[in-house]
A protein has these predicted regions:
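Catalytic domains of carbohydrate-active enzymes, especially glycoside hydrolases
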Residues: 76-95
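Compositionally biased, low-complexity intrinsically disordered regions
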Residues: 1-5
């Protein structure tokens, strides 16, 4: 029998550990959290490659078994509740039933990767191989249609294949670029209701990624989940079209925005405020040294539509809104804020103008920085464990002051990062 005093201490410690969501709500309200809030794996842009997930399970002494690949496009591994607890993760992510290839994440079956790891992939994950031995994946797992993405035999994730058909502007229709922006069904709503109810008792913050709000996310433009995508689907063609076919692009965004708000209304009707954040868009506006467009172009082509979605969310829910954009986007930060985004990710600290001290000083009381904790293109990938620890602590000191910060690396943790650097990062977080 456990003595009452010890039992009380256990209960008290357990209660204190259940403060993830409360701590999260502090930091996104720009109040100083009790500790740094941590996310690994809650979104498709804050995830961990399946190879590293397997190493983490081994590091923490968890059951040895194949890891589920919850997003095959980037080969992101599932961060299950065992790892959430082991890594002191504060945020849980929810995504739709289908992955980016239009394949339901269910009926998991074992596959062996090019690098020799046994993983679990959805049952309808049907692939073929080209003459070089590269892996080809087909939309919805249908091998009777052309493949939509390829993983080189020396690679660790998929790249979209260019399926752009010749464009005749005289017959180009807005509907051609709306095929993937369908209204949610009762099946979809029941799925979301069930998933949200499953995690209500976990005392974790929740970010939902329902899809359908992307507005030009270049990762989604090729539509790797559609069997025969129509319209403008080439990456280069899309970027050019924002200038040469501006009226067409704006009409696409206008229609997408109306569909998105209709879907968000229906989603809110079944899950209410049981989530904390909604992932809106992953459209990248930055390169390593500059932006893809001027502030004037952003204000004209994107801002009105983002603002319409964000305004509906803020006027009708308690959700915060999440915007991902890689690159040197400091010159667009005020416009992201004007558009109503509450959160910016991944905070690419090695890009031009993205000095964390500057960002925190100029924008830290108006937008939450979700990321920027370790430079995945620099120290995290190529430095020593000591350098990684030093960088993590420095970034947290800067970005976590007065809240407004959720720790994550600059984008996903890749397969070939030295694992000792992953351990160093986790160790630094423990020492804060």
């Amino acid at each position: 029998m456990i003595p009452k005093k010890i039992n009380f201490m256990i209960q008290k410690q357990s209660y204190m550990k259940e403060s993830s969501r409360q701590n999260f709500l502090k930091t996104i309200s720009h109040r100083q959290p009790d500790r740094v809030v941590v996310d690994f794996g809650a979104t498709p842009v804050t995830g961990i490659h399946v190879l590293v997930v397997e190493k983490l399970r081994e590091y923490y002494g968890l059951e040895k078994r194949p890891v589920k690949v919850i997003e095959p496009y980037q080969m992101l591994g599932e961060i299950d509740m065992e790892l959430v607890d082991a890594m002191d993760i504060d945020v849980i992510g929810l995504s739709g039933e289908n992955n980016m290839f239009g394949i339901p994440n269910k009926d998991w079956t074992a596959h062996r990767t090019f690098w020799g790891q046994e993983v679990l992939l959805p049952g309808n994950f049907n692939c073929t191989y080209n003459s070089n031995g590269d892996m080809l994946i087909h939309p919805e797992g249908d091998t009777t249609v052309p493949p939509s993405a390829m993983m080189p035999k020396s690679g660790y994730f998929f790249d979209a294949l260019d399926r752009q058909q010749p464009i005749d502007d005289s017959v180009l229709k807005v509907e051609d670029n709306l095929e993937e922006f369908a209204l949610v069904t009762e099946h979809d709503l029941n799925y979301w209701k069930t998933r949200v109810e499953e995690i209500q008792s976990l005392s974790k913050a929740v970010i939902a990624n329902p899809g359908g709000t992307a507005l030009g996310d270049i990762a989604l433009v090729p539509a790797v989940g559609l069997k025969h995508p129509r319209g403008i689907r080439g990456v280069e063609e899309w970027y050019i079209s924002t200038l040469t076919r501006e009226d067409f692009i704006k009409e696409v965004y206008d229609r997408e925005t109306d569909i998105a708000i209709d879907n968000l209304k229906k989603l809110y009707s079944v899950i209410g405020n049981k989530i904390d954040v909604v992932y809106i868009c992953g459209a990248d506006f930055g390169t390593q040294n500059s932006t893809f467009c001027s502030p004037e172009t952003f204000s004209r082509v994107w801002l009105p539509y983002y603002k319409k979605v964000n305004d509906w969310i803020h006027q009708n829910t308690q959700w915060k809104t999440f915007k991902h954009s890689c690159g040197a986007v400091e010159t667009l930060m005020d416009l992201f804020i004007e558009a109503g985004f509450d959160i910016i990710n991944p905070v690419q600290i090695n890009a031009a103008g993205m000095d964390p001290q500057l960002l925190k000083k100029k924008y830290g009381d108006r937008i939450v920085f979700w990321g920027g904790g370790a430079d995945t293109q620099g120290v995290f990938a190529f430095g020593t464990p000591e350098q990684v620890k030093e960088q993590v602590k420095r970034q947290c000191d800067i970005l976590n002051k007065n809240g407004g910060f959720v720790f994550n690396t600059v984008h996903n943790i890749q397969a070939n990062v030295p694992f000792e650097n992953v351990v160093a990062m986790l160790g630094a977080l423990k020492e804060l």
